[in-house]
Amino acid sequence: MACILFVIELYEKQLILYILYRMIMNYLFPNYLDNEYKGKKIPLYFFYVIIPVTIIRSFIHLFAPDGGAQSIANIPLYLYSNQGSDTIVHLFSEWGLSQFLFGLLYIVVLIKYKSLIPLMYLFLVIEYSTRVLLAFYKPVVLEGYAPGGIANYFLVPLFVILFILSLKKHR
């Protein structure tokens, strides 16, 4: 009898997890891409802020002479050979290109496919939490604190909250 109750309880837990999984997957990957955002309003409004911040950062990394590596991130480029510092600046420029493309994607989502906003927040959670982990796993020599490095600790929980709110239906 206890075995049967255990199987029923396990089945109920799996069923609940499956239902939650399907609900989240339907929000992240809607059957039809449309411009209908169903989540709370705060994540939508905050998404308007993310776009210019992302594009401005991308332009700094693309067009600043040092790509923002020393002037913003406090990486002491003068400690490296010319080839080494040029490589770092080049990698910052490539990062800027990546940020610019994400900024364009965010614009497309905001204009045409608002139903993908929860997925965009999931990407932001993954990106910024991975940045925090990489700071410990592969630390970089800095002459001070990089503003982005400090901001990541605040942005991860913020993006988690915005992600969760983007999944909740707005009434």
Task: Tell where the protein language model's regions lie, with residue ranges.
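Non-cytosolic membrane-interface motifs at loop->transmembrane helix junctions
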Residues: 142-154
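Juxtamembrane helix-break-helix junctions at the cytosolic face
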Residues: 103-118
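Membrane-water interface at the C-terminal end of transmembrane alpha helices
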Residues: 157-171
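Hydrophobic alpha-helical membrane segments
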Residues: 119-136
